[in-house]
Amino acid sequence: MSLHLSNVILHQLSKNDQDELMVNYRSESLVNDSSTENLVAELHRVFHSKAGKGFGCFQSDSEFQIWLNELQRGELNFYDFSQKCAVRLKEELAKYPFADEGILVFAEYQSLATDYLFVGILPLNQSLKVTEGLDISATDYLDINKMDIAARIDLSVYEADKESNRYLSYIKGRVGRKVADFFLDFLQAEVGLDSKQQNQVLMQALDDFCTDAKLEKQEVNEYKKQVYEYCNGQIKAGEEVEIRELSGELPPSPSGASFLEFTQEQGYGLEESFPADRGLVRKLTKYVGAGGGLNVSFDSLLLGERIFYDPETDTLTIKGTPPNLRDQLTRNR
């Protein structure tokens, strides 16, 4: 991975005897070497792979934004920037029930010609190691894959377009922890691009496009398969869905209108690009549902062929079961 590291520093969040959250500040930034580059590269990879990220932008009175601008102009050095932010983060984090201990990371770096600022809390975990004398001892390690309190600012987009609603991204975290609320409060930011909503609108626009074109079932399935393959390819490549590019992959309607023209004429309000939602994209070629101890998933092509649904009785009929399922059912009659 091509990554150029500019600055990185660690501070530690811990609780004192009164269970109050404290910050143990490192005295200076870390040296830029292979270890720190590998750390930031792993942070970038894990953050990028996290599903369901939120996007936003700074509020007009954001202190974090003021400090960031001062950092960008060279009026504030990286160490002082990290200290100011650490104080504010500690004050905000103390308001929430998940005020975890951990390692606070600030990193400024470039990857694939894009500049980023990363802020995150890395959980510390314990494991065992074997010493040179072949004894067993405990050791702490950074559990980066379990990171769920982190945000990243695309500095390249931020510098080019401060009116953008998506230069800031953050991990939404586990349900019930309100991690997203915390990070928005800390950064004094507001929700911007809703990528899941954009994906839902895309799916609706595709359904409407097929209906408007009066396509046969087989043609509809082929359209959805093409959209799935494009979106899935973008997910694997770490790229976003580009509506113009997607439209170029699809054949026009019988009237000659492209998918892009259709979405623009009908006013769907789709952004030019946005991250694909893996769960929603999957439903283009599959019917998926779970609940009440039942988990059902099958290719959409099978509906009406081997699988039939009766909405009046809410009954799903399957003709021809998979061999391994049939074997289990036969043995346990």
From Swiss-Prot:
Keyword Signal part of the UniProt annotation: no
Protein name, UniProt field: Nucleoid-associated protein VV1167
Similarity section: Belongs to the YejK family.
GO cellular component, one term: bacterial nucleoid
Keywords: Cytoplasm
InterPro entries assigned: Nucleoid_associated_NdpA
The keyword Electron transport is assigned to this record: no
PANTHER family: NUCLEOID-ASSOCIATED PROTEIN YEJK (PTHR38772:SF1), PTHR38772
Organism name: Vibrio vulnificus (strain YJ016)
Localization terms from the record: Cytoplasm, Nucleoid
Main location, first listed in the record: cytoplasm
GO molecular function: double-stranded DNA binding; single-stranded RNA binding
